[in-house]
């Protein structure tokens, strides 16, 4: 082979090698870029996943705290309600005891309750209903009550005592025909004033 041919072959090989090196270099650079891009993307996705996880964890934490506060408040209200109801039960039992003992204070209160109810009914012929234990009390005060109601209303008022009823104390006063009736029993009064009493009981229990 001549020197010229060797040189041509050598140049061809050199060009081929150069091109091969260039291709390899580009391939390597592209490969490195792909890897770098992949790592960057993976890092971004990782951060996004972590950020999402942190947000979910924070939301869950806030939800748990919120539910705990709500449950705590509900239990506190239930406990308060239980105490208030217990206070009412105790008060009711004490009032019932006072009524059963027929104390002077109770008899005076009974008289006031009958007077108030009679004026509210506003008729001249009234019927008084009380528990059996209070029938004698009413008999002893009926003249005084009649005189008081007559004076307050300006109308001559008479009373009859009806059949005993099942109540703790107090009285029901109604017209003899039953058209108008006022319940001034202990139970009815407690029910009427319950909202106000609840507020007062709560103040004393939880101040």
From Swiss-Prot:
Keywords: ATP synthesis, Cell membrane, Hydrogen ion transport, Ion transport, Membrane, Transport. SUPFAM superfamilies: F1F0 ATP synthase subunit B, membrane domain, V-type ATPase subunit E-like. GO terms for molecular function: ATP binding; proton-transporting ATP synthase activity, rotational mechanism; proton-transporting ATPase activity, rotational mechanism. InterPro entries: ATP_synth_B-like_membr_sf, ATPase_E_C, ATPase_V1_Esu. It comes from the Archaea. It is found in: Cell membrane. It is a peripheral membrane protein. The keyword Kinase does not apply. One of its GO terms (cellular component) is proton-transporting two-sector ATPase complex, catalytic domain. Gene3D superfamilies: ATP synthase, E subunit, C-terminal, F1F0 ATP synthase subunit B, membrane domain. Its main location: membrane. One of its GO terms (biological process) is proton motive force-driven plasma membrane ATP synthesis. Has multiple subunits with at least A(3), B(3), C, D, E, F, H, I and proteolipid K(x). Belongs to the V-ATPase E subunit family. PANTHER family: ATPASE H+-TRANSPORTING V1 SUBUNIT E1A-RELATED. Component of the A-type ATP synthase that produces ATP from ADP in the presence of a proton gradient across the membrane. This is A-type ATP synthase subunit E.
């Amino acid at each position: 082979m001549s020197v010229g041919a060797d040189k041509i072959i050598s140049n061809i090989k050199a060009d081929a090698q150069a091109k091969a090196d260039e291709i390899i270099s580009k391939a390597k650079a592209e490969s490195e870029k792909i890897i770098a891009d992949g790592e960057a993307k993976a890092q971004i996705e990782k951060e996004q996943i972590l950020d999402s996880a942190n947000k979910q964890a924070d939301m869950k934490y806030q939800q748990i705290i919120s539910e705990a506060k709500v449950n705590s408040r509900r239990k506190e209200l239930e406990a308060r309600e239980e105490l208030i109801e217990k206070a009412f039960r105790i008060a009711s039992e004490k009032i019932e005891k006072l009524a059963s003992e027929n104390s002077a204070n109770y008899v005076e209160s009974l008289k006031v309750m009958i007077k108030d109810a009679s004026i509210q009914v506003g008729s001249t012929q009234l019927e008084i209903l009380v528990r059996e234990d209070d029938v004698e009390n009413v008999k002893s005060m009926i003249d005084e009550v009649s005189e008081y109601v007559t004076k307050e209303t300006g109308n001559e008022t008479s009373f009859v005592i009806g059949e005993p009823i099942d109540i703790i104390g107090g009285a029901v006063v109604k017209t003899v025909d039953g058209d108008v009736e006022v319940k001034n029993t202990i139970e009815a009064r407690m029910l009427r004033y319950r909202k106000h009493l609840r507020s007062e009981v709560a103040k004393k229990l939880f101040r």
